[in-house]
Amino acid sequence: MGDSSMNISVLGIDIAKNIFQLHGVDSSGKRILKQRIVREQLSAYVANFQLCTIAMESCVGANYWARVFQRQGHIVKLISPQFVKPFVKTNKNDANDAEAIVEASIRPSMHFVPVKQVEQQDIQSLHRVRSRLVKNRTALINEIRRLNLEYGITIPQGALKVKSHLRSVVDDKENELTISSRELMEELYDELVEFEERLKKIEKKVKLICKEND
């Protein structure tokens, strides 16, 4: 690392899965660093800088790196990608993106995205998984209702109603279900119960995290 790297005022980082592009400027806005670096070396590399402002787009992985750099003492600014795009001067590539991030970060009117701490990240992750489970459960419920209609069996809407009615359908030996279709409905019932149990676990975890951080 050259001496100029130690005088960086603002460092823009275009984050990726493996290769990161860095663009550093001094207090006058002059570029003094243009560097590509692999993920495994990024933290140690930036730790050698004098404390500066580090700007990144608020994309996947940004909150993790923001926390890493904050622990090193740097000031971190996250910017929504839509606000960085207007500052890309030429063709879009990693180097130009990193430069655009710096340009956007020094604008007085720029709005920044708060860095999520680990607990906030946990809650967001749980909510995302919960949303997916709810979507998949809804698809399962719709499939259960459609399949039963093929056997002349109507099941009302709503997760709780579908669950209780499907159990009754499986246990009812007088309906048109064959051994094969009854086994299928039993499997669908078990799948629905599993969704309910997973959703309850997630909701319990969210409440626990919120309680621990009150």
What are the functions of these language-model segments?
Residues 1-214:
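A detector of single, family-specific signature residues
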